[in-house]
Amino acid sequence: MATVNQLVRKPRLRKIVKTNVPALEGSPQKRGVCTRVYTTTPKKPNSALRKVCRVRLTNGFEVTAYIGGEGHNLQEHSVILIRGGRVKDLPGVRYHIVRGSLDCAGVKERKKGRSKYGVKKAKV
C-alpha cells in the first residue's frame, strides 16, 4: 500500500483504453467519399468475393469499409456514411457502410432485418 506522500509524488497510472475504430474519433458515424470499390477474398477457411470500398473521410482518414447486403449501387465518388464494426474474416476492414443513407441505396427486396439494410416497410 502506497503512502499519501508517495502518491503525491507519483500518482497511480490510469489504464489507457485503445479504440478499435480510430478513424471515427469518438463519433457514432462519419461521412466519406468512395475512392475505390472492389472485391476481396476472406481468410481461410472461408471463401467468397466480399464487397469492400476504400473511403476518404471528412477528417482526412482513408479507411476500408465493408458493403453489407446483396447488391449495391456504389461507385467511385459516391458519398457514404460509415459506422464502426469489423469484418472478422477480412483483415484490415474495421468499418461498415450504412445502407440506405446518403448515396448508398438500401437492399432491394429485403423483408427481414430491414433496419440494418436501410429498407422501408413494404406497402400491403
Swiss-Prot record:
Identify the species of origin.
Answer: Buchnera aphidicola subsp. Schizaphis graminum (strain Sg)
Q: Which NCBIfam families match?
A: rpsL_bact
Function according to Swiss-Prot or TrEMBL: With S4 and S5 plays an important role in translational accuracy. Interacts with and stabilizes bases of the 16S rRNA that are involved in tRNA selection in the A site and with the mRNA backbone. Located at the interface of the 30S and 50S subunits, it traverses the body of the 30S subunit contacting proteins on the other side and probably holding the rRNA structure together. The combined cluster of proteins S8, S12 and S17 appears to hold together the shoulder and platform of the 30S subunit.
What is annotated about its quaternary structure and interactions? Part of the 30S ribosomal subunit. Contacts proteins S8 and S17. May interact with IF1 in the 30S initiation complex.
Q: Return one Gene Ontology term, BP aspect.
A: translation
Q: Which CDD domains match?
A: Ribosomal_S12
Q: Which PROSITE patterns match?
A: RIBOSOMAL_S12
Q: What is this protein called?
A: Small ribosomal subunit protein uS12
Instruction: Give the keywords, sorted.
Output: Methylation, Ribonucleoprotein, Ribosomal protein, RNA-binding, rRNA-binding, tRNA-binding
**Gene of origin?**
rpsL
